[in-house]
Structure formats: structure tokens, C-alpha cells
Regions:
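C-terminal His-loop and adjacent cap/lid subdomain of alpha/beta-hydrolase
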Residues: 1-106
């Protein structure tokens, strides 16, 4: 699925129904990931766990932490933010640690 088409679809839903759709609609982009895996960004995340917490417990995801793992070692982690927010480095700590990023509007 091309990322541009996904963003266009999300924006068309928000345009048709209004901006307050966050209780049932969230878009999380994965920068640097190829189609389904690979690329120079993270390629693993707990999407199903986040979806289950949202559906079963009413806890909507404000961010999902994604990882790039080689063998049993985490090489990097990044926060995935609900669109249109994106991850921004705080300027302190390792750029390979999701805790050193915050989700905010571009």
C-alpha cells in the first residue's frame, strides 16, 4: 500500500466526517520501513497489542514503539505517532532510543 494513498484516504475520511474521529480512527506511519519489512527504519511493532487494548479496553494508542531487531538485539526503537503528528528528537540521548523522541505536529 503506497503511503501517499493511505494518507489521502485518511484525510478524505476526516474531511467528510470532521476532525474529531480519533475515538475510532488512527493512522500510524512507519518511516524507513519497506513494504511490510526491511528498510533502514524499524520493522517490528506491537500493532495487534495496541489494537486489542483499544478495542477491548478503550485505551486509544497515543504512540506505538517500533523496533529494528537483529538476532536478539534491539538496534533501534522509534515512536510511531498518530498522523498528522510525527516523531521529533528531543536533542538529548541516543537517536536509537524511542524514549528520546516526542510526538508532535510538524
Amino acid at each position: 500500500i503506497a503511503p501517499g494513498n493511505t494518507i489521502e484516504y485518511y484525510e478524505s475520511v476526516v474531511s467528510a466526517l470532521g476532525p474529531d474521529q480519533g475515538d475510532w480512527l488512527r493512522l500510524f506511519m512507519v518511516p524507513g520501513m519497506g513494504h511490510c519489512s526491511g528498510g533502514d527504519g524499524p520493522d517490528q511493532a506491537g500493532f495487534m497489542a495496541a489494537l486489542e487494548r483499544w478495542r477491548e479496553g478503550g485505551e486509544s494508542p497515543e504512540r506505538i514503539t517500533a523496533y529494528r531487531v537483529t538476532g536478539n538485539r534491539v538496534e533501534m526503537s522509534r515512536p510511531l505517532c498518530p498522523y498528522p503528528r510525527t516523531a521529533h528528537y528531543k536533542g538529548i540521548g541516543s537517536v536509537n532510543d524511542a524514549e528520546n523522541f516526542e510526538c508532535r505536529l510538524p
